Amino acid sequence: GNFSGFETMHYRSYGESQNYMRLPEIFMPTEFLHGLYDGGHGAGLYDYWEMMRKHPRCIGGFLWVLADEGVKRVDMDGFIDNQGNFGADGIVGPHHEKEGSYYTIKQLWSPVQILNTSIDKQFDGKFSIENRYDYLNLNTCRFLWKQVKFPLATDASLSLIHI
């Protein structure tokens, strides 16, 4: 709906969202992705977020839902019943354990973005960085990184990892 110049409709498609951002109202969908429909938010977030960041009328949006939902069954030794996959749609699990979407969202919404998409043999140790903070200069931040080489499946020295 439209509330005092804010367009807040839930779950507009990607194309509809682009159209709404061209209207005079400020675009802030109160829910624009639902974890149930993409396995927990991470799958569709990048495209939506990049579109929203580029439109001056968009001021953000909300994801549904933070934590997996379910009923703790006393008749099943505390098993959390969410009727299959109907409540397992959160950014974190039912005990607030971090799930895959948590890390995706953390990376996509980080105010410091590493723009290098790949590191090749000519890599000189320098990264291109984008500052998405509104009021903070990156000279006040400290960055640590480590370059590692993971073994390839074809490496002769590859050994089994025992878990």
Residue ranges and their predicted role:
Residues 86-124:
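Non-catalytic, glycine-rich low-complexity segments
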Residues 16-17, 48-50, 115-116, 131-134:
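Generic recognition of flexible, low-complexity loop/linker segments
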Residues 61, 105, 129:
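Conserved, mostly hydrophobic/aromatic
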